[in-house]
């Protein structure tokens, strides 16, 4: 192991070691150079912050809540959104207490109905019986309860497809446009303007981005869904323009569905055995407008990187594991609609947050504007288990000794534990490829093995009762840089 580390360290030194979230791999790069470059691909501060937060709430809310469907038609009467009150304080208390750090609201789903009083469409909550502004209310509650706020804005828009004067796929040409477009009687407090070559729908979309980013911030995440009920007129999205606007107005925000964060590949809470954040792209992600859904089991292993056709780009792109607490994304009823158990939520949390990804758990409010007692009870129990398990590191006070293979720990008193947590120093790149946990019981005995580490790796195994344990690094891309090792007991 020591010899391997010295070899890789020498390789890194010879590469002049520039780092960044994207590095090119040249056609003549040797295998060892490819792996050395992969180590130097590191997250942006915004990506690192999102990863370290780990746990976020998804809130699907809108006309579908009242019609009982998952995807609306775009021709719904706004009056179906018959909301009397939205108790966004209740939402945020529940989210905070379970340990979530961020809330993402569906400000506009595929139906095109907007939850805020937009200057640019009449198809929204402002045309419904509800006189409030759900986006504003939730953003205020997030600030009150110490949560970050983000929004989901669907590129798909069935209303703009179906309306007689709809802008989606209307065949308009890209011409010089100013964002935001001035609307008489509705000035912006933020007086900045931006010029782009846009068609009608991209202008409409960016005007709404401007509203959300300037009037409801600070915004920590912008969520772009890749799903489309259907398309029309060959409509293309000018994501590079969207990105420029987001970076200008919300420089601390990450963008989901593009180069900052990617989809985990399913909506069922399944996780990969090895979730790598450094993955290969055939094109430079900085110039890409569309990002395909990545569903392969292996996205970033050594074998995957070394079989990628050159040249290519190595890019840092963490996964978000999005899953709903209910059977469906929107609330339908409190009788027949299934709700996940606390066991299930705790299991998904351990596998996602503890598997080098971010957990985005959807908790949809009902027609009364509140989160159902069924959902809140599950979250309260799952939150209790997370706090009681992961709030007590059993290795505090241990004597640690670095070895040629990893690290050995000796406790003053025997501990009972069945979880091991490793974290890497993200500023030093993804290095560990596999590791083993050994315990001392009349000699060293291997208990469990894990794959890559990244931000956080939680290893689960049968309960142990020991005074000594060690972590052996079985394979690594460079000298391991572990930030922490912890042990816990899940009852």
Language model regions located:
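Sec-dependent signal peptide recognition
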Residues: 2-7
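Mature catalytic domains of secreted/periplasmic carbohydrate-active enzymes
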Residues: 19-461, 472-483, 488-489
